[in-house]
Each structure stands twice: as structure tokens, then as C-alpha cells.
Regions:
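Flexible "arm" and connector segments at domain edges
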Residues: 1-200
Length: 200
């Protein structure tokens, strides 16, 4: 499956600019943030495997687990697109072809762990790792029955709807988690990205 994340990349770039989020700040927290999301992905996959057993009595739980898997995958991809923003356009990373990509979640873990060895995220090695992380994310998404490009568009739409403010003291954008604020947020509908059986 061929995937073009150019528009998603541009949307994330606009969000960063609006919220005064620098690429350097994304680099600083990348490993911690992406490992947290990988933990959520592993947990969702574990739930999916449990709910997929023949003796499980609640089939709807499978769909919920799939949604959590796709959400975690997209979160990892968003973090990776943000931290690699300075190299992606020059290397045309937003253009992906998953036909030869591995779909092993352990491979994704290895790629993420290797990033911890980089002191900067602008050299060729980090570019290759970022590209491969996105490729594996796309393939995993496809494996669980979802179109990665459409899922990422939903994720970007949700992120752009979040409200908050830039804290001048910490120099960070802080999300407004108050209930009233959350009622205005868009919630990504990953079902819109589900691949119909005849399209697989």
C-alpha cells in the first residue's frame, strides 16, 4: 500500500507553529514519550489477543482493542513526524510504500530503542530509523485492518482540535484538560480508516 503523509506533515507543522512548539523540544522528550505510547500499543495488542480467543463472550471488545491499537500507532507516528520535521521534507519521508515493510511489533520496539543512542536527530542514521518507524507503523496499522494514511488524518484532526495555552514560564504548550474544554474536542473516528475486506 502506498501512503502519502505530506498533508498530515503540513498540518502538524501548522499546529507546532500555532502552539510555539519547537522541534528541539520534541527531540528532548521523544524517547520518553514514544516509549510511553509503545507501552500503550503493547497493552492494546495484549487485550486484542485476549479478546480474539474463541471463548471470549464479548465480540465488541475486539473492535475497541483495535481502536486502541490504531490510536497508539498513530501517536507513535505523530511523535516521530514531529521530531524528524527538519529532515523529512528533504528526504521525502512522508511518501511511504509498505509492500516490503516488516509488521513485527518487536521490530518497532528495536527501532525506537536504537533512537536512544542518537545525540541528535538530524544525521543519516536517525533519518533511516524515523523512516523505518513510520513504515512499521503503517504496516502494523494495515495488519489490523486500517488504512494508515486515513488513520493519521483522523489523528491530526483530533490533535488540532485540542485547546490550551503556551506557558511563558515553562516555554511549553499546555493542554486544557478541563471538562468544558474537552467537550469541544474532535475525537478521531478510526472506523473511517478501516479497510473493507475487498480492498485488502
Amino acid at each position: 500500500m502506498k501512503i502519502d503523509l505530506t498533508e498530515v506533515h503540513k498540518r502538524l507543522e501548522a499546529i507546532r507553529a500555532e502552539r510555539k512548539i519547537t522541534v528541539d523540544s520534541q527531540k528532548k522528550d521523544y524517547i520518553v514519550n514514544v516509549m510511553e505510547k509503545f507501552g500503550e500499543l503493547a497493552s492494546a495488542i495484549k487485550d486484542y489477543e485476549k479478546y480474539s480467543q474463541p471463548d471470549w463472550s464479548y465480540p465488541s471488545d475486539i473492535q475497541e482493542a483495535e481502536q486502541e491499537i490504531v490510536k497508539a500507532i498513530c501517536d507513535i507516528a505523530v511523535l516521530t513526524l514531529n521530531v524528524g520535521a527538519e529532515v523529512f521534507f528533504s528526504k521525502r519521508v512522508p511518501l511511504l510504500d509498505t509492500s516490503t515493510a516488516p509488521q513485527n511489533v518487536n521490530w518497532l520496539s528495536l527501532l525506537i530503542s536504537d533512537c536512544a543512542d542518537f545525540e541528535c536527530y538530524e544525521d543519516y542514521n536517525s533519518y533511516v530509523h524515523f523512516y523505518n518507524i513510520l513504515m512499521v507503523c503503517a504496516k502494523l496499522c494495515e495488519q489490523y485492518g486500517f488504512n494508515f494514511q486515513l488513520a493519521m488524518e483522523e489523528a491530526a484532526k483530533e490533535i488540532s482540535s485540542h485547546t490550551g495555552f503556551f506557558d511563558e514560564d515553562t516555554k511549553k504548550w499546555k493542554q486544557d484538560y478541563r471538562w468544558k474544554a474537552q467537550t469541544t474536542w474532535y475525537h478521531a473516528d478510526y472506523e473511517l480508516a478501516r479497510i473493507e475486506k475487498e480492498d485488502k
